Amino acid sequence: MSRSSKKGAFVDAHLLKKVIEMNKQAKKKPIKTWSRRSTIFPEFVGNTFSVHNGKTFINVYVTDDMVGHKLGEFSPTRNFKQHTANR
């Protein structure tokens, strides 16, 4: 079930504040976040986020194609180990 259109997209306030500060300063160092649930806004484009996957932080560089998706979509939490060949 999708989010109600009258509510709008969700982003953590502290994350949006950090992005605005980084854009003003024109710095490009990674922004560390645990907020996988935040929606990527157009202001995020060009920034790098270190998104926590439950164990480590994975660097995610935001491009135009990612706008509207969640940060957690680009930081996988599960690693698939391939099945071994039949013996």
Swiss-Prot record:
The gene is rpsS. It comes from the Bacteria. GO terms for molecular function: rRNA binding; structural constituent of ribosome. Protein S19 forms a complex with S13 that binds strongly to the 16S ribosomal RNA. It holds the Pfam family Ribosomal_S19. Belongs to the universal ribosomal protein uS19 family. It comes from Mycoplasma genitalium (strain ATCC 33530 / DSM 19775 / NCTC 10195 / G37). One of its GO terms (biological process) is translation. One of its GO terms (cellular component) is small ribosomal subunit. Keywords: Ribonucleoprotein, Ribosomal protein, RNA-binding, rRNA-binding. This is Small ribosomal subunit protein uS19. InterPro entries: Ribosomal_uS19, Ribosomal_uS19_bac-type, Ribosomal_uS19_CS, Ribosomal_uS19_SF.
